[in-house]
């Protein structure tokens, strides 16, 4: 595993796969030419993939697509505004007001998602402002230093989204239908099935059981290849029963105050040798 220090991330996001990237990439297929991140979220999967392919980050949440477009087109202006933004509960609360200015709306979204607990401020105000209280590091308050460091690292994110990277705002069915061809690879990280989690309304656009069935039906008809992430549960095992299934290592989960295990389902066979140590 290459570790996470060399990877880029714009913001934390509920269900994000930043700590799982090496495991996911190890089971990506070979010889695809278009990576489609169908439920993009923070887009860490497509942002960090190094293969020479077209990369499409699709996300239906307009706050997220606006943020990435503004970062791409107005990088210096947005980062300067964020560096001038205080780590403040008052600021956090005020950033829930919608702005007609795209740059200001991108700044407000970033404040919400980065100054909240576990990135849940992307759309849930009741998750609250993440105040620094006890934890310190060499730069002072850990929460504060993370805020400042994350803003400075946005330059690297901006560079990444200018390289073979396109942003779309389709619903998942339209995204798949629009791009599907033999060399397309769809990475799908839909909202976790409610059968596999205790909390609800964690996403701006939740997924019902019918949505999961609809996605699986569509993926079973595609010309390309697909990988689906989720937690182990009866629903996912039923709708992907004919797919290859791999259990990833158990990891600590701060939101759940326990441990979780991600599962991936694939409609293709293992195509790599010694896949956990493959360079990609």
Give, region by region, the residue ranges found by the protein language model.
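Short, solvent-exposed coil/turn elements at secondary-structure transition points
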Residues: 41, 173, 249-251
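Short loop/helix-cap segments at secondary-structure boundaries that form the rim of catalytic
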Residues: 46-51, 178-181, 234-242
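Structural beta-sheet core signal
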Residues: 57, 188, 226-228
């Amino acid at each position: 595993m290459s570790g996470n220090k060399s990877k880029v991330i714009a913001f934390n996001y509920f269900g994000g796969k930043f700590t799982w990237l090496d495991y996911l990439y190890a089971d990506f297929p070979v010889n695809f030419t278009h990576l489609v991140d169908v439920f993009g979220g923070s887009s860490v999967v497509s942002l960090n993939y190094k293969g020479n392919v077209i990369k499409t980050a699709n996300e239906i949440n307009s706050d997220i697509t606006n943020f990435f477009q503004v970062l791409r087109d107005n990088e210096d202006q947005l980062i300067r505004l964020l560096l001038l933004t205080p780590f403040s509960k008052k600021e956090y609360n005020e950033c829930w007001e919608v702005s007609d200015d795209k740059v200001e709306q991108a700044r407000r979204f970033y404040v919400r998602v980065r100054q909240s607990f576990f990135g849940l401020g992307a759309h849930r105000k009741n998750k609250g402002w993440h105040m620094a209280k006890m934890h310190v590091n060499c730069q002072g308050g850990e929460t504060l230093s993370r805020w400042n460091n994350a803003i400075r690292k946005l330059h690297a994110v901006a560079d990444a989204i200018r390289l073979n990277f396109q942003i779309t705002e389709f619903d998942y069915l339209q995204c798949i239908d629009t791009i599907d061809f033999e060399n397309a690879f769809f990475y799908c990280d839909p909202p976790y099935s409610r059968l596999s989690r205790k909390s609800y309304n964690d996403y701006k656009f939740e997924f019902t059981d019918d949505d999961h069935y609809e996605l699986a039906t569509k993926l079973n008809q595609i010309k390309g290849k697909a990988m689906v992430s989720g937690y182990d549960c009866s629903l996912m095992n039923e709708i992907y029963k004919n797919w290859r299934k791999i259990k990833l290592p158990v990891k600590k989960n701060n939101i759940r105050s326990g441990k979780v295990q991600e599962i991936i389902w694939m409609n293709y066979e293992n195509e790599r040798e010694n896949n956990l140590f493959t360079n990609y």
